[in-house]
Amino acid sequence: MPQLESVKKIWGHAPHNAFTDLIRFRERWWCVFREAEGHDLPGGTVRVLTSETGVVWESAATLVEGGIDLRDPKLSVTPDGRLMLVMGGCIYDEDGEYLIRAPRVSFSEDGHAWSAPRRVLSEDHWLWRVTWHDGRAYSLSKLGEGDEPRRGFLYSSVDGIEWDWIAEFKLDGVSETTLRFLPDGEMVALVRPGYIGTSRPPYREWSFCETADRIGGPNFIRLPDGSLWGSGRLFTADGPRTVLARMTTSSYEPVLTLPSGGDTSYAGMVWHDDLLWMSYYSSHEGGTNVYLAKVRL
């Protein structure tokens, strides 16, 4: 069974620090998340942290776009060796009511200097996480909010700016999605609120199964031994928790609960030095803070 080796708070300066991601780039750690006054309040900005060892963290950059609430930043490395950020960009009226959104992307050569957030796709889209494979970026865009029907469109891109439609995920309540690839080219999708999908090139036809548990903020990775490990928010008898799950292409089994509670989830996952490193956010210690956990599998 997985064992929690360590966990520590690495950031808590804003009233609400949430929606994390984690990556290794140029032999350093990089962690991103949203800073704001609250979970659903406008005015979010994106903070980029960096660390050489994962022990001491420092701020590398802050991304801001006037009048836009930047949300759910996710990191990837482009084929030409740059860091890429994909974010949701939401607009609110003067009373703070949600109006519309569109995805934003930003790029950096060094993690410190970033291009201005650039809008991609059309209004109502939200590219939630980008995964690169064989020189192309893939992402599922979620559409629809509130009482509107939700839809999920799979896109690909060669540059992260111009996106080509591939297929629609016709699932009830389809939302946040992480995509990964197996060595034979099969694509696997972990989809909120609780689906696992598989497809082979050209990724137009999909097979889905439902998971036993509902998943919020889904992420997963494939380890060198071929095993799949997932994470997300699990609603337990004691309230929401961030969990690590043993995963296959047809199952998702929570096996470890991280120290967490309340407003929590959205883990970044990296396999490094024979440990699973996980960034996540939680409000179990007062305030909503960013944490880094190391898990031995």
Predicted regions and their residues:
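Beta-rich carbohydrate-recognition and catalytic domains
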Residues: M1-A18, I23-L70, V77-S265, V270-L297
